[in-house]
Every structure is written in C-alpha cells, then in structure tokens.
C-alpha cells in the first residue's frame, strides 16, 4: 500500500492520478514540512474530500478524540498522529523531550526556512530562534546549515537536551498533557470519540417525531 503525504489539494490530485492507494492530507498545523500554502486542516481536509476519490487520512493537529471526530466529519477516513505518538511510553526519544512536549503549548513551535520557501515547523528552542533571527537578516541555507544539521537534531532525542538542535513538533503540543502507552492512547481516543458521537453530538440528530413530520 502506497500512502503519499500531500499539503495541498492539487498535490493530492496528482498523487491520485499517479496511482497511490491513499493520501495523507497535511494541514498547516503539522510538524515538519507543511508546504507553502499555509492552509489549515479545517479548510484543507474538506476541500480535498470534495475532489479526491481515494481514501484520505487527515494529518496535522490531531491528538485526541475531538480531532478524530472532526476529521471524520470533514471527510477523512481517519487521522495520522506524529507529535502525539512522540509523547508515549513506547516512543524511543528521551523522556525529557516527552515532558517538554507536555509542557509546551500551541504557540511553542517555530516556523523556519520560511524565507527559503521550504517551511518547517519545529519546536521552539534556542537554536530555532537563532535560525529565525538569521533569516530575518537575509541568511541563506549555507548560513544556517550547521545549526540545523541532522546530527544535532538526533542528539536532542538521544540526550534529552531541548536546545541541542532542531527537532520537529506540531501545534498539537498544546493539547498533549500526558505520556500514556500507545495502547492506552488509542483506546482512550476510540472510547471518547464514541462518547462524543453518541452523547454530545447525538443531540443534533433528528428525533423520530421530526422525521415522521
């Protein structure tokens, strides 16, 4: 099965024509590269659902039952979670970084490489702030190459030093408040999604009397 990441409807349509089995449609909230259109998932997901016929997974800003229910309502078949799974017991990253994700809020990420038209959403730290400042001064990639080196980013996850390098994290950090096991997380999301659909949202379903009328 081939699932292709897309950050725009046009890219999703191209992937569909090329024969992929499904797409991951990534809204602007996502960690890593959100594309250059800056369209949030609330708009991008239904826009893609209106035109794309193959299965679609919603990505970017998802981490709980509310996000899952919203994604289904917007036209996706499910959700993809990146930053949320980083903060789980099974995640191989350092415990200090998991706790940093829990401590961060939705404003914590920085956008780097904006001036280079290769935007990336990363966790805000001393290095990301330095990169942003250099970009404002007209820096080119060569000027920040050492700061954003992959080896430095890997050391963040291995050593647990938040400021050791650049590391990706999405805006969903603002809704992450614990470090559960993957099993606990999935069961919680499914249970709470069912409660939302059959509880709070059930109030919007027509009654038998209304249907008969």
Question: What residue spans do the PLM features occupy?
Answer:
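Short intrinsically disordered, low-complexity coil segments enriched in acidic
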Residues: 1-7, 200
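Hydrophobic faces of well-ordered beta-strands that scaffold small-molecule active sites
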Residues: 2-4, 23-25, 56-59, 79-81
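Glycine/Thr-rich beta-alpha phosphate-binding loop at enzyme active sites
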Residues: 5-45, 88, 92-94
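Conserved active-site-proximal phosphate/metal-binding subdomains
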Residues: 35-41, 45-57, 63-213
């Amino acid at each position: 099965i081939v699932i292709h990441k897309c950050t725009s409807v046009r890219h999703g349509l191209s992937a569909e024509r090329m024969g992929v089995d499904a797409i991951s449609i990534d809204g602007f909230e996502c960690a890593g590269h959100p594309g250059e259109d800056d369209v949030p998932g609330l708009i991008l997901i239904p826009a893609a659902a209106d035109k794309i016929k193959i299965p679609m997974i919603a990505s970017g800003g998802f981490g709980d039952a509310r996000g899952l229910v919203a994604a289904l309502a917007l036209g996706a078949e499910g959700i993809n979670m990146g930053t949320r799974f980083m903060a789980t017991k099974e995640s191989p990253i350092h415990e200090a970084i998991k706790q940093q994700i829990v401590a961060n809020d939705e404003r914590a990420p920085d956008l780097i490489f904006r001036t280079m038209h290769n935007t990336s959403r990363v966790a805000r730290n001393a290095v990301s702030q330095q990169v942003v400042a250099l970009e404002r001064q007209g820096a080119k990639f060569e000027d920040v190459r050492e700061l954003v080196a992959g080896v430095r980013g890997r050391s963040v996850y291995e050593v647990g030093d938040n400021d050791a390098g650049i590391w990706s994290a999405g805006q969903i950090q603002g809704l992450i408040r614990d470090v559960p096991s993957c099993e606990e997380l999935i069961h919680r999301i499914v249970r709470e999604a069912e409660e939302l659909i059959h509880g709070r949202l059930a109030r919007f379903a027509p009654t038998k009397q209304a249907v008969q009328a």
